[in-house]
């Protein structure tokens, strides 16, 4: 085989195959048969095998994927991949439009309306036009490197086309990997024939496919991808989102054709109404619609809250309802002892998933709706929302169906169940209940608490079943039981070492994370931060009296009493002693001396909806300015910042004669200079 001929032929084949891939995967307009395409690929493979040094990284043969990945490396996202705030009604969309226009000072604004593909978000990086890295969204700040798996997706170009638009030296684009309904059906038919478990829905199938360790298995999932964002588009001379989508197409990315440029909110609502009726006609699943401010300069001015862009919103379709049968009622014990009833259902497909269980909330809910085993019921589900039984179909009730009564003893440990007067919840009275311990450990390890990576439900249950842990503090002694861990099902040396490293990394977590991780009743993330900031150490919190706790602005008597009760418990003392012995951080960050700034010594209450900040953001700003952000109005309140739809707090401030500032007045007075 002549080398000089191969040097000419390989680039020709790459360009020809790339052209036909684009026509097939992106345009859906193939010009040649599958057999003819396979012949071109086979010729290219043979030439590359004969002359390995001529194989290019953007060769279509590289879509087959590289070697099996032992683990997925972490990839930081810059800027973060934010999630979107949700709208569920016309009123929500009109409110979004109002906030946008107010934030822009009444400027004209147009919106790009797009489909919200129900898949897995990805970020792709190109260097000099060559695809070099792809990552999942992860938590928005950090994702997983799935480059080799993304190479197997035919609609993702390995090299960008610069024919219609110049290709920048460095480019980051974002989009969604998905699976079509037809591919899901075909894969499930093959799985059923082999007697294997079926894939539940296209989204889960796509997510699972993209996280396969072997890229060849990813390729078997026949995934696809739509791209919808150019990061730092303004730096590339792109002025608006609509033009960014066109630029993506020019580079030969696959961009969803179902989009609309609207110049008024009424146009947006018309487009939304149209897709509400047509969404089931699509060959893939969507879980809503996305509305974005078109002008990129306006997007930049509107900015972000701590979680969402202010210039975009996701419209969620109304919850789907289906009829099914209650085959049983089961109970689940939570970390604080609350026992929650659930309806065991005859399987029914709702919102793209098979639903076998729905929450019944509490005893009163069951009694009010008179839900009985054997009843035909209407079950509602929307997106990731937990399914719930909304009503009984009385005319279909079996004649022998009996009213359901709450049991007197805990299903997990047999202890007495009690219901405190004035509360809807029924609780297990046994602090040593294994179900409570299981849930408490899961909460301790969860992302917003200690954030122990790799410690999921199955592993926690296995650790408890094998007697390796009894409580959360025992996690920090698992390094002493490494051999026993390795013997657990699905746990090899690599997995065990990763788990132990993840646990060890949390010893120096901030104090507020540990406080939240303890699972104190009524203490959420905000209250945990208040406690950490006020006391500065776990020891100080333990010694605090009820009056001191109640006096903390924003904490309130209910939380204060719960905190006091928690630290009065001998079992809590035992847990904290074990955590201290394990070297878990019990001290907060040292604060600067007396608060300085324009709000030094002031207590500020925020009420209503603000244009510039979320509630969390303005409370953090108040603290940065030296003040305290409180959750309720009292005579100690210095002033109130009142936004749109301010309620009882505003009324109380007026009754007490406490100054009330608008958002603009607050900015002028405390943020100027």
UniProtKB/Swiss-Prot annotation:
InterPro entries: BRCT_dom, BRCT_dom_sf, DisA/LigA_HHH, DNA_ligase, DNA_ligase_AS, DNAligase_adenylation, DNAligase_N, Hlx-hairpin-Hlx_DNA-bd_motif. Zn(2+) binds at residues 410, 413, 428, 433. The active site is at residue 116. It catalyses: NAD(+) + (deoxyribonucleotide)n-3'-hydroxyl + 5'-phospho-(deoxyribonucleotide)m = (deoxyribonucleotide)n+m + AMP + beta-nicotinamide D-nucleotide. Its cofactor is Mg(2+); Mn(2+). Residues 54-73 are annotated as: Disordered. DNA ligase that catalyzes the formation of phosphodiester linkages between 5'-phosphoryl and 3'-hydroxyl groups in double-stranded DNA using NAD as a coenzyme and as the energy source for the reaction. It is essential for DNA replication and repair of damaged DNA. Pfam families: BRCT (PF00533), DNA_ligase_aden (PF01653), DNA_ligase_OB (PF03120), DNA_ligase_ZBD (PF03119), HHH_2 (PF12826), HHH_5 (PF14520), Nlig-Ia (PF22745). Belongs to the NAD-dependent DNA ligase family. LigA subfamily. GO terms for molecular function: DNA binding; DNA ligase (NAD+) activity; metal ion binding. GO terms for cellular component: cytosol. The keyword Transcription does not apply. NAD(+) binds at residues 34-38, 83-84, 114, 137, 176, 292, 316. The keyword rRNA-binding does not apply. This is DNA ligase. Keywords: DNA damage, DNA repair, DNA replication, Ligase, Magnesium, Manganese, Metal-binding, NAD, Zinc.
